[in-house]
A protein has these predicted regions:
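FMN-binding flavodoxin-like domain, especially the glycine-rich phosphate-binding loop
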Residues: 4, 12-16, 24, 28, ...
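A short, well-structured beta->alpha microelement
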Residues: 28-40
Length: 147
């Protein structure tokens, strides 16, 4: 299966998580990481794994803004896309994991099929966010072989 890992990162946490998940997935899949995702470059028949931190007041990080704005403005039909979201944030903010929640809702609204519920990682409780992300993916990654 082809997998597109779409990364939204400000300080690097989401990128580290994406790198760890790529290492797990590339054993059995064709995986591509997008640090500056452009909608036109993404395979819409692939599984999209979104790894995003939250920036500012619950915002999508700057590097993922063009992708997110494209979705909002163009409303593409994503019914052929399956996806899951890893959201990273700090529960000390009332906008905890806001970017991941917004991305998840937007993809769902555009018809994409959620393969697994969103993982929300609280960096206040998980100083190494890669660890819960790897455990989450390990618990269901074999399902990617049958979808």
């Amino acid at each position: 299966m082809d997998i597109e890992i779409i990364v939204g990162s400000t300080l690097g946490s989401a990128e580290y998580v994406a790198d760890e998940l790529e290492a797990l997935l590339k054993e059995q899949h064709q995986v591509k990481i997008h640090l500056d995702a452009e909608f036109e470059e993404l395979n819409q028949q692939a599984f999209w794994l979104i790894c995003s931190s939250t920036h500012g007041a619950g915002d999508v990080p700057d590097n993922l803004q063009p992708f997110f704005q494209h979705l909002l403005e163009n409303q593409p039909d994503l019914s052929s896309v399956s996806y899951s979201v890893v959201a990273i944030g700090s529960s000390s903010y009332d906008t905890f994991c806001g970017a991941g929640k917004d991305l998840d809702q937007t993809l769902s609204n555009l018809g994409a099929k959620k393969l697994k519920e969103r993982l929300e990682i609280d960096v206040d409780l998980e100083p190494v966010p890669e660890e819960p992300a790897v455990a989450w993916l390990e618990s269901w990654k074999n399902e990617l072989n049958v979808n």
